[in-house]
From Swiss-Prot:
This is Replication-associated protein. Divalent metal cations, possibly Mg(2+) or Mn(2+). Gene3D superfamilies: 3.40.1310.20. One of its GO terms (molecular function) is DNA binding. A motif (RCR-2) lies at residues 71-73. It comes from the Viruses. Its cofactor is Mg(2+); Mn(2+). ATP binds at G228, P229, S230, R231, T232, G233, K234, T235. Its EC number is 2.7.7.-, 3.1.21.-. Essential for the replication of viral ssDNA. The closed circular ssDNA genome is first converted to a superhelical dsDNA. Rep binds a specific region at the genome origin of replication. It introduces an endonucleolytic nick within the conserved sequence 5'-TAATATTAC-3' in the intergenic region of the genome present in all geminiviruses, thereby initiating the rolling circle replication (RCR). Following cleavage, binds covalently to the 5'-phosphate of DNA as a tyrosyl ester. The cleavage gives rise to a free 3'-OH that serves as a primer for the cellular DNA polymerase.
Length: 348
């Protein structure tokens, strides 16, 4: 019967599971603890050993700990890679260093330059030229905002820098362009000379006494509500008074002109105007939600001229309390038969 294998044999240590480190680098950071060599002595030894690898730069710095024990720190830069598995390759006169490949020579150089002992060096230090960091998306957008001078240039730069975003978010970029580069509204050009435009005396009195005498005063000026037939010149008259916000068929506050002195609301059905009280009552600092835009505060404080035809008379669609508010905050004028806001030369 065969004897069992010796337990001692089974417990023998096998080959090491930790292979010898393999060094493969052009730059090394060495630290020789408890080393009483001078920096010059160590540098000469290392230079002699590394001649085949063409050393480009070697710096040795001496550091004394509080107990007076000397350490030597070394930065080595080679022109060709050193590839070795020999753990004693950098051993000098029985002194064995801690070995680390170097990625950032500038940091190592800064560290060993702050030691409190002697130092020696040879060659020329080579620092890696850092590539400039690419600007972030926010930084690129900030550059576009800062450098563009008008709406078209802004949109063109966005299209070039962010083509995909431009394709799917053009509406938002157009909104931001309008906010960045506010263009004054075009001056209204009347189709009639001023001398051919006429206005009922009571409306002239409201404009002269309430609109012109106390602009931005403590009292809110009354608006003007005009209901009458089409093609009678009421829009031309209303738009010829001065700088204004003009709304036709719908009210969109996206391009609200803060310098306007009144609003013209032309052929906008009452049911489609949720902010009618703010506009008719010349209210200040009200909040609106423009189409495709964020909520915004309207400074307001200016009156409105509301123009409607007989078939869309607001009063027909109002509740009694709403009619009362309209009369309290606006002069209501129904055009009589044959009335016009202009006169042709032949009719004078």
């Amino acid at each position: 019967m065969r004897a069992p294998a010796s337990s001692a044999a089974s417990n023998r240590p096998g080959p090491s599971n930790h292979p010898t480190p393999r060094w493969n680098s052009k730059q090394f950071f060495l630290t020789y603890p408890h080393c009483n060599l001078t920096p010059s002595e160590l540098m000469k030894e290392l230079f002699s050993r590394l001649t085949e690898k063409i050393p480009g730069y070697i710096k040795v710095s001496q550091e004394f700990h509080k107990d007076g024990d000397p350490h030597l720190h070394v930065l080595i830069q080679l022109n060709t890679k050193l590839c070795t598995r020999n753990p004693k390759f950098f051993d000098v006169q029985g002194f064995h260093p801690n070995i680390q490949p170097v990625r950032d020579a500038e940091k190592v150089f800064g560290y060993i330059s702050k030691t409190n002992g002697d130092s020696d060096e040879m060659g020329e230090l080579q620092l890696r030229i850092k590539k400039p960091e690419k600007p972030t998306r926010d930084q690129r957008m900030a550059m576009i905002i800062a450098s563009s001078t008008n709406r078209n240039e802004y949109l063109s730069m966005v299209r070039k820098e962010f083509p995909f975003d431009w394709a799917i978010r053009l509406q938002q970029f157009e909104y931001s362009a309008a906010a960045l580069f506010t263009e004054p509204p075009p001056v209204y050009q009347s189709p009639f000379p001023n001398e051919q435009i006429v206005c009922p005396p009571e409306l002239v009195d409201i404009i002269d006494q309430e609109w012109n005498q106390q602009p931005n005063g403590p009292r809110r000026p009354r608006s003007i509500y005009i209901c009458g037939p089409s093609r009678t010149g009421k829009t031309t008259w209303a738009r010829n008074i001065g700088r204004h916000n003009y709304y036709n068929s719908t009210v969109d506050f996206t391009h609200y002109d803060k310098d306007a002195i009144y609003n013209v609301i032309d052929d906008v059905p009452f049911k489609f105007l949720p902010q009618w009280k703010a506009l008719v009552g010349a209210q200040r600092d009200y909040i609106v939600n423009p189409k495709y835009g964020k909520k915004k505060k309207i400074p307001g404080g200016i009156p409105s001229i509301i123009l409607t035809n007989d078939d869309e008379d607001w009063i027909k669609d109002m509740k009694p309390a709403q009619v009362e508010y309209l009369h309290a905050n606006a002069h209501v004028h129904y055009m009589y038969e044959g009335q016009k806001f202009y006169v042709l030369p032949a009719e004078e």
